[in-house]
Amino acid sequence: MRFTLYPAIDLKDGQCVRLRRGEMEDATIYGNDPAVRARQWQDAGFAWLHVVDLNGAFAGRSENAEAITAILGAVSVPVQLGGGIRDMAAVERWIEAGISRVILGSAAVKTPQLVKDACRAFPGRIAVGIDARDGFVATEGWAETSSVAAVELAARFEDEGVAAIIYTDIGRDGMLTGPNVEQTLALARATTIPVIASGGVGDLSHIVDVYDAGTITGVILGRALYDGRVDPAAALQAVSLR
């Protein structure tokens, strides 16, 4: 499977932001027009975009619909969306609006039947977001930590047709200290579902670390991309061998 780089567009109050460790009060604003950012990443050569409705993740419903719709109107590359999507109506609404892949996070823990139903209704279009703190899954915009282990949650959906798992190490997110390759790789080896790494990329070497690990199928790029620590062309070149 082709290794994919996913520029992240995290939305808070209609703005493009980056958080540290998921803390809403520790947000850096990177622009008031997310659609412009989306075009920028598409023009840089990225084949996918990763969009998160941060307000929605806390509220349990879409809160940045206008910005998301603007992004969809601005680009032709596929977009995956997470944050606040907790029922089938929301899944249907976003897929009909043009989202290529819907990410279910809190719902995967609290209403796993939704994941199964959505996978049947929209084959190949549903991903599971596993956000872990010390190996245990966090929910509700990371405000709560469950007693469910990340590997255990992945196993629940092994044969349900999930298109991908986005695995985020919360402690690394936005910190630029490098992704948790070891835990991500362990998860990827424990499931047949493609696993995408998220959280902690700070420079090109971190991308190469994930790429060279094998088994992991992609990585999400956030603060390092926005701060200019990662050059898009160099990153795309580095992962072009498979």
From Swiss-Prot:
Gene3D superfamilies recorded for this chain?
Aldolase class I
CDD domains named among the record's database cross-references: HisA
Primary location group:
cytoplasm
Q: Keyword Cell wall biogenesis/degradation: yes or no?
A: no
Tell me the InterPro entries matching this sequence: Aldolase_TIM, His_biosynth, HisA_bact_arch, Isoase_HisA-like, Isoase_HisA-like_bact, RibuloseP-bd_barrel
Gene Ontology biological process: L-histidine biosynthetic process; L-tryptophan biosynthetic process
Q: Which reaction does it catalyse?
A: 1-(5-phospho-beta-D-ribosyl)-5-[(5-phospho-beta-D-ribosylamino)methylideneamino]imidazole-4-carboxamide = 5-[(5-phospho-1-deoxy-D-ribulos-1-ylimino)methylamino]-1-(5-phospho-beta-D-ribosyl)imidazole-4-carboxamide
- Molecular function per GO: 1-(5-phosphoribosyl)-5-[(5-phosphoribosylamino)methylideneamino]imidazole-4-carboxamide isomerase activity
According to the UniProt record, one GO cellular component term is: cytoplasm
Q: Where in the cell is it found?
A: Cytoplasm
Pathways involved: Amino-acid biosynthesis; L-histidine biosynthesis; L-histidine from 5-phospho-alpha-D-ribose 1-diphosphate: step 4/9
Active site (record annotation): 10 (proton acceptor), 131 (proton donor)
Q: Which UniProt keywords apply?
A: Amino-acid biosynthesis, Cytoplasm, Histidine biosynthesis, Isomerase
Q: EC number(s) per UniProt?
A: 5.3.1.16
The protein's matches in NCBIfam families, at most eight in alphabetical order, are given as: 1-(5-phosphoribosyl)-5-[(5-phosphoribosylamino)methylideneamino]imidazole-4-carboxamide isomerase
Family as reported in the entry's similarity comment:
Belongs to the HisA/HisF family.
What is this protein identified as? 1-(5-phosphoribosyl)-5-[(5-phosphoribosylamino)methylideneamino] imidazole-4-carboxamide isomerase
Q: Which organism is it from?
A: Granulibacter bethesdensis (strain ATCC BAA-1260 / CGDNIH1)
